[in-house]
Amino acid sequence: MIQVESMLEVADNSGARRVQCIKVLGGSHRRYASVGDIIKVTVKEAIPRGRVKKGDVMNAVVVRTKKGVRRPDGSVLRFDDNAAVLLNQNKAPIATRIFGPVTRELRGDQFMKIVSLAPEVL
């Protein structure tokens, strides 16, 4: 459950380390984002010579949450951190590598590139 002001780790090699959610996209008064939702973020920490700089405003897709994902069989998949992957204006990942596991819920036609780059799909 990601909301405005939530801090997330960045699960890719774009150069950002931590981002902060500034808007949950998909509705005028939408409050929470879960795995697979697109959010607007600002970069709070970045490494030198990365693709993004501190202060950049970008789109991101949530790939892991502490709250978890409920599957149709009743099981819940929870993670140790809240993480996102940065996207460009065309909703494609700007990075070439993804770190850590991602969930099967991202397998829609929109995020197959992220699923294919991920080392593990749960």
UniProtKB/Swiss-Prot annotation:
PROSITE patterns: RIBOSOMAL_L14 (PS00049). The lineage of its organism: Bacteria, Pseudomonadati, Pseudomonadota, Gammaproteobacteria, Moraxellales. Gene3D superfamilies: Ribosomal protein L14. PANTHER family: 50S/60S RIBOSOMAL PROTEIN L14/L23, LARGE RIBOSOMAL SUBUNIT PROTEIN UL14M. Keywords: Ribonucleoprotein, Ribosomal protein, RNA-binding, rRNA-binding. NCBIfam families: rplN_bact. HAMAP family: Ribosomal_uL14. Part of the 50S ribosomal subunit. Forms a cluster with proteins L3 and L19. In the 70S ribosome, L14 and L19 interact and together make contacts with the 16S rRNA in bridges B5 and B8. InterPro entries: Ribosomal_uL14, Ribosomal_uL14_bac-type, Ribosomal_uL14_CS, Ribosomal_uL14_sf. The keyword Coiled coil does not apply. It holds the Pfam family Ribosomal_L14. Belongs to the universal ribosomal protein uL14 family. One of its GO terms (molecular function) is large ribosomal subunit rRNA binding. One of its GO terms (biological process) is translation. This is Large ribosomal subunit protein uL14. Binds to 23S rRNA. Forms part of two intersubunit bridges in the 70S ribosome. GO terms for cellular component: cytosolic large ribosomal subunit.
